[in-house]
């Protein structure tokens, strides 16, 4: 039988395996393990609990540091740094200086907000820190004037304070004056942080400068409505307020009120009856007209053209621009003028008024004789410096015999045929034009000019006056007169072509002509010699050292001349009324109830 594989376990000791272990000493085993550990240095003999505690503390420190960095970056976005705050307090202009361009970063919408988990734990601390930044410390609150000086936009600060105090915006009551030198008689002023003593004193001091003023105070703001005696600009008004209330310019707002706003007028009217409001003087007209019933009913009056024509006729106004300007200036006192300004057809009304006034004046002039017309002009002339001797002295200075001039002048005024034209000729600078122009100005005559001879209507002004003047007639002008105007110089009826009208037939008014041409010595104009009276002016017109004329020829001088030689000129006596009173002037409007009584 073959032998079995493997060890032979039949023996007691099992072959080479020891059944029992030999005992050894413990110290020798420990030394062997220590020597093996020191040599290899591969095993950490530290306790597991101690190692876990150190790693947890390190992790917490790292998380706290990271959280503080994120919080600091977040604060930089929303909290102004102390350095920039100090810089802005020193000078607001430095805040606008930047080396890098400023771009506004738009915050994008975030669907999922990231949360570190630390913000919730520090929420209480952050809220307390924010409260400490906003709330001022007790006992260190600044007054309103100091806060105004430190704020960047002072005007916006005053606007906000005014609206919070009075419940209405300052710009709702005023209209803007961009220039500080534009004058106005009405001003709305807001004063900030005025002392009570100065405010009470201002109620008395403002009476010397204003015909009406309104003063109301709410908190630190004082509202003023000033209607000054003399219009002032904003700079002058600020200077006045500084002297009265002892405040600076930054504590004041001033703009003129909205005078055409019914809401603003009603605000001032109702505010005048409120408690704590002080007013002085009569209510301004622009407030009364928009609030009081009597003024409101008067403003509803319709425009009456006849009243405007009557006013222009009484003031002897015929120019359209002059009528429009002067009548508009009466809107504050005249109800019809106010209705004229509210009308949408002002140019048409002005044109119609000027046309009707010219028609009435022309008809009145034609109705009067030359004697009556001269008498009317003498009455209308003011009693100023003027003497008839000035006219006589000037004629004698030119070597003209006064008796002969008076005889020809008498026939000239009467319009006698062949004596209807006076010609003053001579060298230049002898006073020919001055003499004739002064007489024409007194009698309100008309001027014709040969420069318009190419037009068919250049003689049309002769239909509008009692006397005409052709100044500085040259040789071509005399040729034209010799060819076409002989019958006009005779004083007979001739035809004048008028614009937009049929040719008009009229008697030529007395005509004055000044010229440098000697018509008497030229045989070519021999047919004009018998139709004109000629006066030669050989002497140069005298002037004093200051360049003033040596003879005062004005309206007063001619009025005195006609009064002095009224009988010598065979002028008829002025026609009076039945009872010796002068005739009543033209009346274009119906009489009122009080006037008829």
UniProtKB/Swiss-Prot annotation:
Q: Where is this region: Disordered?
A: 119-141, 574-597
Q: How is it modified after translation?
A: Phosphorylated. Sumoylated.
- Residue positions where Phosphoserine is found in the record: 81, 91, 104
Q: Chief location of this protein?
A: host cell
From the record, which residues define motif Nuclear export signal?
Answer: 90-99
Q: Which UniProt keywords apply?
A: ATP-binding, DNA replication, DNA-binding, Early protein, Helicase, Host nucleus, Hydrolase, Isomerase, Isopeptide bond, Nucleotide-binding, Phosphoprotein, Ubl conjugation
Q: What class of enzyme is it?
A: isomerase
**Record location of the Glycyl lysine isopeptide (Lys-Gly) (interchain with G-Cter in SUMO) cross-link:** 507
EC numbers: 5.6.2.4
For this chain the motif Nuclear localization signal maps to 75-77
- InterPro entries, alphabetized: Helicase_SF3_DNA-vir (IPR014015), P-loop_NTPase (IPR027417), PPV_DNA_helicase_E1_C (IPR001177), PPV_DNA_helicase_E1_N (IPR014000), PPV_E1_DBD (IPR046832), PPV_E1_DBD_sf (IPR046935), Rep_E1_papillomaV (IPR016393), Znf_lg_T-Ag_D1_dom_sf (IPR037102)
- Location in the cell: Host nucleus
Per the record, the GO terms for biological process are: DNA replication
Write out the GO cellular component annotations.
Answer: host cell nucleus
A GO MF term: ATP binding
Isomerase found in the keyword field: yes
Catalysis: reaction(s): Couples ATP hydrolysis with the unwinding of duplex DNA by translocating in the 3'-5' direction; ATP + H2O = ADP + phosphate + H(+)
Q: Annotated region DNA-binding region: where?
A: 137-300
- SF3 helicase domain segment(s): 400-550
UniProt binding sites for ATP: 426-433
Q: Which family does it belong to?
A: Belongs to the papillomaviridae E1 protein family.
- Quaternary state and interactors: Can form hexamers. Interacts with E2 protein; this interaction increases E1 DNA binding specificity. Interacts with host DNA polymerase subunit POLA2. Interacts with host single stranded DNA-binding protein RPA1. Interacts with host TOP1; this interaction stimulates the enzymatic activity of TOP1.
Q: What is this protein for, i.e. what is its function?
A: ATP-dependent DNA 3'-5' helicase required for initiation of viral DNA replication. It forms a complex with the viral E2 protein. The E1-E2 complex binds to the replication origin which contains binding sites for both proteins. During the initial step, a dimer of E1 interacts with a dimer of protein E2 leading to a complex that binds the viral origin of replication with high specificity. Then, a second dimer of E1 displaces the E2 dimer in an ATP-dependent manner to form the E1 tetramer.
- This protein is called what? Replication protein E1
Q: Which organism is it from?
A: Canine oral papillomavirus (strain Y62)
């Amino acid at each position: 039988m073959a032998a079995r594989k493997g060890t032979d376990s039949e023996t007691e000791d099992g072959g080479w395996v020891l059944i029992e272990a030999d005992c050894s000493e413990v110290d020798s085993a420990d030394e062997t393990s220590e020597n093996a550990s020191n040599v290899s240095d591969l095993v950490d003999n530290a306790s597991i609990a101690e190692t876990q505690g150190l790693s947890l503390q390190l992790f917490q420190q790292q998380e706290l540091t990271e959280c503080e960095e994120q919080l600091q970056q977040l604060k930089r976005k929303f909290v102004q740094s102390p350095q920039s705050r100090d810089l802005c307090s020193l000078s607001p202009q430095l805040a606008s200086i930047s080396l890098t361009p400023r771009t506004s970063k738009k915050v994008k919408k975030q669907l999922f907000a990231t949360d570190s988990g630390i913000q919730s734990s520090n929420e209480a601390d952050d809220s307390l820190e924010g409260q400490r930044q906003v709330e001022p410390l007790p006992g260190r609150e600044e007054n309103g004037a100091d806060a105004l000086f430190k704020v960047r936009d002072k005007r916006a600060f005053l606007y906000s304070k005014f609206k919070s105090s009075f419940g209405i915006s300052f710009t709702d009551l005023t209209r803007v004056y961009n220039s500080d030198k534009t004058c106005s008689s009405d001003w709305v002023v807001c004063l900030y942080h005025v002392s009570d003593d100065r405010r009470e004193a201002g109620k008395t001091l403002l009476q010397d400068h204003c015909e009406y003023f309104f003063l109301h105070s709410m908190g630190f703001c004082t509202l003023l409505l000033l209607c000054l005696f003399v219009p002032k600009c904003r700079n002058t008004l600020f200077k006045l307020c500084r002297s009265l209330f002892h405040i600076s310019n930054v504590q004041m707002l001033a703009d003129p009120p909205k005078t055409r706003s019914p809401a603003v007028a009603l605000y001032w009217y109702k505010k005048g009856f409120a408690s704590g409001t002080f007013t002085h003087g009569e209510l301004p007209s622009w407030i009364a007209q928009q609030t009081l019933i009597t003024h409101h009913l008067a403003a509803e009056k319709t425009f009456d053209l006849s009243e405007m024509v009557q006013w222009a006729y009484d003031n002897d106004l015929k120019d359209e621009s002059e009528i429009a300007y002067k009548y508009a200036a009466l809107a504050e006192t005249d109800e019809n003028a106010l209705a004229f300004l509210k009308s949408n057809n002002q140019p048409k009304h002005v044109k119609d008024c000027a046309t009707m006034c010219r028609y009435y004046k022309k008809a009145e002039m034609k109705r009067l004789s030359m004697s009556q017309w001269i008498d009317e002009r003498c009455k209308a002339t003011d009693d100023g410096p003027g003497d008839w001797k000035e006219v006589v002295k000037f004629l004698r200075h030119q070597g003209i015999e006064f008796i002969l001039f008076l005889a020809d002048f008498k026939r000239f005024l009467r319009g006698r045929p062949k004596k209807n034209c006076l010609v003053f000729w001579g060298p230049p600078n002898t006073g020919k034009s001055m003499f004739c122009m002064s007489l024409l100005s007194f009698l309100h005559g008309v001027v014709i000019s040969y420069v318009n001879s190419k037009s068919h209507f250049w003689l049309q002004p002769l239909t509008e006056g009692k006397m005409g003047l052709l100044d500085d007639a040259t040789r071509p002008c005399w040729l034209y007169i010799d060819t076409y105007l002989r019958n006009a110089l005779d004083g007979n009826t001739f035809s004048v072509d008028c614009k937009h009208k049929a040719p008009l037939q009229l008697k030529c008014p007395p005509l004055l002509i000044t010229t440098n041409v000697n018509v008497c010595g030229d045989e070519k104009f021999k047919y004009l010699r018998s139709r004109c009276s000629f006066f030669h002016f050989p002497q140069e017109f005298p002037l004093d050292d200051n360049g003033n004329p040596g003879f005062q020829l004005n309206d007063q001088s001619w009025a005195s001349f006609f009064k002095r030689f009224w009988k010598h000129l065979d002028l008829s006596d002025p026609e009076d009324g039945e009872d010796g009173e002068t005739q009543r002037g033209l009346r274009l409007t119906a009489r009122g109830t009080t006037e008829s009584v």
